[in-house]
Amino acid sequence: MPLPCGGAIDVCVLPNTQASVLRACHDQLASRQPVSITLSDSGSLGLGHLPTPGALSFQYIPKLRLRIAGRGADSLALARLATASGIHTELQLRDAAEAQDAQRLGIERVTTLTVPSALPKLDDDPWTAFLLAVHDVDWEETLLAQALIGPAFYIGAIGSKATHARRCERLQTIGFTKRQTHRIRGPVGLIPSMRDASSLAVSVLAEIVEAYQRKVRYPLSSTALALLADMPNVPDTHLFQSSSCTNA
């Protein structure tokens, strides 16, 4: 198949592949777990990394998820941009009126924070990015401490270099090591010193997406497997996944 760039690719279509393998792949991704599929030289699919001679193994990982804890225009702008970009976004807000605004903007998951001592249960996974967008010492310390004990691949906090240094010092005084606090990015964003909420949102989201791509990047490969299936009762958001391969 010729490409507009002047190159070409070969395409192999498997029209009647095993639906059970595709469904198992979907279910595992929907539960935020990575999954591998092996394609044998005969064209059959198998779940998992199978050491079959001549087979190719493809790995699929969960999509990026973003959790934002904060208040004000910065939080809302980032959540709105991330949602428009197709990123599953959770917004944790202290202000009930802002929570209503977020729901009107179409943010899928909005939680109202009550007191620092009663945070929502942490459900971050290795493909979750967490951003702190609040300037309150008690909330900062508690929210960052919670994020640090979790597996989020990205932890960031809005604020200046001086503010970031003070945050890390406070966390170290309550028992976190320097190595642990080094996980926190600050100041956040690919472009420094953004002042308005919209520009800051673009800068921060770009940094998060870059960090996610670095985490999931595979070695360059000449082969990719795209899963495109039409199965009843399976949300479209998980029907299409693609991945590069390694030799099984």
Task: Tell me the role of every PLM-derived stretch.
Residues 50-54, 118-119, 175-176:
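Short, flexible segments with low predicted structural confidence
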Residues 19, 116-119, 189-195:
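A short acidic, often aromatic-flanked loop/helix-cap motif at beta-alpha or helix-coil junctions
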Residues 100-103, 140, 164, 197:
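Alpha-helix N-cap/helix-start motif
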Residues 33, 87, 151-152, 176:
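Residue-level recognition of short, well-ordered coil/turn positions
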Residues 1-111, 125-129, 207-248:
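Segments forming oxygen-rich coordination pockets for charged ligands
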Residues 152, 158-248:
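Adenosine-phosphate binding glycine-rich loop
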Residues 111-173, 201, 209:
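Phosphate-bearing ligand-interacting subdomains
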Residues 18, 75, 137-140, 164, ...:
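Alpha-helix N-cap/loop-to-helix initiation residues
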